[in-house]
Amino acid sequence: MKTSMSIFAAIGLAITTTFAAPESDTEVAARKAALDLAGAFSNEGFKMRDGHWSGTIKPKEHALIAVNLYSGNQYWFSVGATEPAKKISVNVYDETGRLLRTEHYDGGDRAAAGFSPTDSGQYFVSVDLVQGGSSSFCLIYSYK
């Protein structure tokens, strides 16, 4: 229950992050890192969604992004971060705040989570700074 509350409390951060001012150079660098990672999934037939989410993430804070997903599709959520981030993670939660089982790629300042929902609906993607200092990040997701 505590996880559910912290997830939904972070929605404000996600909204602020999503509708921020024009991107800084570090956010552009984070987007490049995320695009490089997402490109690997494109080689497996995944198509990148238009748009991305970027902003700044601090240690022990979450960036939370609400997404609508459809059953029958497969998704990969790719995240890139800039220095001084040392390790970043990405997780997927259902609408009740329950952590879902995903495939993971962990590459230090890049991470990805793969997921195939059994039900269509709203899900939440959490980006967490595990190690390092406050950093720019970018989330891109792909589907097939």
Which residues fall in each region the model found?
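Predominantly extracellular/luminal regions of secreted and cell-surface proteins
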Residues: 21-46
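Generic detector of short alpha-helix boundary/capping microenvironments
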Residues: 8-9, 33, 48, 65, ...
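Bacterial N-terminal signal peptides
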Residues: 6-16
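Generic detection of intrinsically disordered/low-complexity segments and helix-coil linkers/edges
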Residues: 13, 35, 40, 47, ...
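Acidic, Ser/Thr/Pro-rich low-complexity intrinsically disordered segments
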Residues: 22-23, 51-136, 142-144
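Positively charged n-region of N-terminal signal peptides that target proteins for export
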Residues: 1-5
